[in-house]
């Protein structure tokens, strides 16, 4: 370091700055050669990367599950809330129908209330699952058809957005063709009237 006579720094401050410069120089890559490209993976990380991506994902998943569990209330299980679920009605109708039907058949055939109850509950669960899946597939298919229709309409060319060129001679041509048709119709009517007047109304046998 060049000595400057009018410098305000003391010798102690200069000695303290020299180790700092050495420490800063130690952070620089020592195996660097002139013209060499330094990649990002060769440099030390700027931020602490203690948690991996999988650990962060698990942590976020736990937080999401905790928020979902805390958001559950007893009022969510009311009849009004349950009937507002899209496929709850179809699943309930098919499940209860299967329960009554299978329970009645098993009770009539085996005369055992326990066996009939077991079969009825099993039929309720299976029927509800089948009804729910049928309703879900129908809704999914209808959503796909609606999305396809939206995409088809969006891809269509909108003619009203562009100026359509009009030929000024077209109205005159239409009028001329209309007058010509009118004159031909009148001429044919006159010919028919003349032919009918010239034809005799009596006939010799």
From Swiss-Prot:
One of its GO terms (biological process) is negative regulation of programmed cell death. Residues 184-196 have a biased composition (Polar residues). Its main location: mitochondrion. It is a multi-pass membrane protein. Residues 110-115 are mitochondrial matrix. Residues 133-205 are mitochondrial intermembrane. Keywords: Membrane, Mitochondrion, Mitochondrion inner membrane, Transit peptide, Transmembrane, Transmembrane helix. The chain crosses the membrane at residues 91-109, 116-132. It is found in: Mitochondrion inner membrane. Residues 1-27, 165-205 are annotated as: Disordered. Coiled coil: none annotated. GO terms for cellular component: mitochondrial inner membrane; mitochondrion. It holds the Pfam family Cox20. GO terms for molecular function: unfolded protein binding. Involved in the assembly of the cytochrome oxidase complex. Required for the maturation and subsequent assembly of the mitochondrially encoded COX2, the precursor of subunit 2 of cytochrome oxidase. Interacts with COX2. Belongs to the COX20 family. This is Cytochrome c oxidase assembly protein COX20, mitochondrial. It comes from Saccharomyces cerevisiae (strain ATCC 204508 / S288c).
